[in-house]
C-alpha cells in the first residue's frame, strides 16, 4: 500500500510541477523553450503518419528562441503550435502523461497528437 501511495504522490507532484517557470526565474539570461514533451524518441524526427503532420506544442518567454524551436520542429517534420509564454508549460506537461496512457495500456509508443484547425 505504501508503494502505491508514494507513486500517487509522485504523479501528483509531476502534475503540479512548475519546474520550467522556476528554472526561468533562477536563470533569467537563459532562453528556455518547452517542446518535445509529448512524443517518444521513435517519432521525434520525421514523424510520418497517414493523417498528416502531428502537432507539437511549445512555449517560452523569448520570441527569438521560440522562433528557432519552431524552425527545428518544421525541419523535424512537425506542425508547431505556439502556446505562449512559459506559464503554458504547466498545461503542456500533462500531455506527456496522456501520451503515455496508450503505451502502458496497449504497448504502443509510436503515436502523437494532432490539432485540427478550422
PLM feature segments, named:
Residues 1-48:
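Rossmann-fold NAD(P)-binding glycine/threonine-rich loop
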Residues 54-118:
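Active-site-lining helix/loop region of Rossmann-like oxidoreductase modules
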Residues 50-52:
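A short, glycine/Asx- and small/polar-enriched loop/turn
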